[in-house]
Amino acid sequence: IDIVEDTLITLADIKYNFGDTVATLVDGVTKLKSLPNGTKKQDENIRKMILAMAQNLRVIIIKLSDRLHNMRTLKYMKPEKQIAISQETLDIYAPLAHRLGIAKIKWELEDLCLRYLKPEEYEHIKSLIDSKRNERSEYVESFIKTIVKLLHDTGIKGNVKGRFKHFYSIYKKMYEKGKEFDDIYDLMGVRIIVDTEGECYNTLGVIHSHFKPVPGRFKDYIAVPKSNNYQSIHTTIVGPQGKFIEIQIRTEEMDRVAEEGIAAHWSYKEKTKVTKGDQVYGWLRNILELQNEAEDTQDFIKSVTEDIMNETVFVFSPKGDILELP
């Protein structure tokens, strides 16, 4: 990414050796880094980054990967720089990863930001997790064996794996919502991957027939996907020993999109294609419209940030129609 800035190699050299596509991507990412730090100029840099993203989605995927690398090596920088970069990452890059559905990058960025922005809280959460790590791991492994047997007995083929809540998500529950560590419902979880959408609902029936579901903890994102194309069934049940455990049920394709987001469209031999009707592309088109409507750079940044942070709400009308609320 830094080759044009840090070496004698030019864009013309890259174009000659690797073609127009690679040269365009390198140029797009390089331009995002070309302005010096400073409040107004930093706003302008962010504006250019967002517009470059809207025009070529691969630019922002490269940029997100670059920022993740920067965060992983942030310990070598001065404390004030660590805080500034972490705050920018939490404000801009992590929400972007979320909006594009790239969960793996979002989670790691948020956890790394928490380490530098809230070091005491981070260490407290880490100590709580470490204190019973083996006990929780053994519990989840035992529960997975139970689920595997249930699926086998009912003729459902599925892959079952454990999952644990990320540091930043725990931080928000504890410090922003005032919950105790042991009262967080989805601290432990299990993900069930099946072959078809129909089997997702069959699996849900099997789970609810053997374990008591927790009221108000069921969400069907298959019937009503999130705005970033995320699909899955979520339910929390009362497991063995009376412990709450969240279960996510989805197909392999849904799992790939949930983990990789929009990037999944270019992986695995491009089995699926991004279409212009895709919700993510609709959001990107909206960004270009915001640029035209904004009075100045700061107004544009404010509008886009609000749009990035927006959590779309879906409701059912009395007639059963799905409505999207801002």
Residue ranges with predicted function:
Residues 2-189, 193-245, 250-304, 311-322:
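Active-site helical microenvironments for divalent-metal-assisted chemistry
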